[in-house]
Amino acid sequence: GWIRDFGKRIERVGQHTRDATIQTIAVAQQAANVAATLKG
């Protein structure tokens, strides 16, 4: 039914959002490490 399709779509979007969030956090941590290294 359409409800199951809707649920699958939300699931996919949620997974994509989670992946993007994890990537953003990883990039932010890397940037913080670089900044700390530059400061010495």
Swiss-Prot record:
Keyword Secreted: yes
Matches recorded under InterPro entries: Cecropin (IPR000875), Cecropin_insect (IPR020400)
GO BP annotations listed: antibacterial humoral response; defense response to Gram-negative bacterium; defense response to Gram-positive bacterium; innate immune response
Stated family: Belongs to the cecropin family.
Segments crossing the lipid bilayer: none
Highest classification ranks of the organism: Eukaryota, Metazoa, Ecdysozoa, Arthropoda, Hexapoda
Cellular compartments annotated: Secreted
Pfam families for this protein: Cecropin (PF00272)
Gene Ontology cellular-component annotations: extracellular space
Protein name in the entry: Sarcotoxin-1D
Entry function: Sarcotoxins, which are potent bactericidal proteins, are produced in response to injury. They are cytotoxic to both Gram-positive and Gram-negative bacteria.
Keywords assigned: Antibiotic, Antimicrobial, Immunity, Innate immunity, Secreted
Organism of this sequence: Sarcophaga peregrina (Flesh fly)
